C-alpha cells in the first residue's frame, strides 16, 4: 500500500502508535524493552484526536486513540492490529481505536495478541480500497513503524498485487 505516496508493506497509521514510533526513533536505543518503556510513558499524557475518514461509501468522524491501516494483520511481536487483513484481497483493513480507560487496557492488550481486537467495543473497523484521513493539525504518521511528520490530510491506498517477488523455478509454489 501507500500512505501519502510512501510505500508500506504491513501497516501504516496515525495517532498513538505513530507518536510512539517517533519517540522510539528519537530515543537512541532499540529493542522491545525500549519500545514498551516509550509506550507506557507516552500513554500517560497522550490525547486522542478527532479524525474524519473518507472512503467510497462516505465520511465518518471519530475521536480516536489511533487509526491503523493494514495490508497485513500484524504490527510486530505477534500484535494483530488489523486481525483480518489479507495481502491478497486488494483491500485495506482499518482499525479505529476509540479513547478508553485504564480498565479497558487488559482486555485490549489480550485481544491485540489473540487476534480478536475487532471484538472489543472500543474498536471500529472498516475495509476500503482507498481512504482519506482528515485531522485538525499536522502531526506524525507511520509506515511499517517508521515515523514521518505529515500534514492534516492523509491518503492511504492499496496497490493490488503490488509486490513482485523473484524466485528461482525450483522454489516457486505450484
Q: Where are the predicted features?
A:
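Gly/Ser/Thr-rich active-site loops/lids in small-molecule metabolic enzymes
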Residues: 26-34, 83-103
Amino acid at each position: 500500500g501507500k500512505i501519502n505516496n510512501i510505500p508500506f508493506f504491513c501497516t501504516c497509521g496515525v495517532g498513538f502508535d505513530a507518536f510512539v514510533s517517533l519517540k522510539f526513533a528519537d530515543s537512541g536505543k532499540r529493542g522491545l524493552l525500549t519500545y514498551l518503556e516509550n509506550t507506557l510513558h507516552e500513554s500517560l499524557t497522550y490525547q486522542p484526536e478527532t479524525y474524519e475518514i473518507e472512503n467510497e461509501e462516505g465520511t465518518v468522524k471519530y475521536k480516536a486513540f489511533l487509526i491503523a491501516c493494514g495490508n497485513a494483520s500484524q504490527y510486530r511481536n505477534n500484535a494483530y492490529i488489523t486481525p483480518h487483513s489479507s495481502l491478497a484481497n486488494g483491500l485495506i483493513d482499518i482499525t479505529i481505536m476509540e479513547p478508553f480507560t485504564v480498565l479497558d487496557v487488559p482486555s485490549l492488550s489480550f485481544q491485540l495478541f489473540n487476534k480478536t481486537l475487532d471484538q472489543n467495543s472500543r474498536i471500529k473497523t472498516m475495509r476500503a480500497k482507498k481512504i482519506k484521513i482528515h485531522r485538525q493539525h499536522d502531526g506524525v504518521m507511520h509506515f511499517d513503524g517508521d515515523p514521518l511528520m505529515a500534514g492534516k490530510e492523509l491518503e492511504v491506498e492499496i496497490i493490488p498485487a503490488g509486490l513482485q517477488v523473484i524466485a528461482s523455478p525450483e522454489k516457486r509454489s505450484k
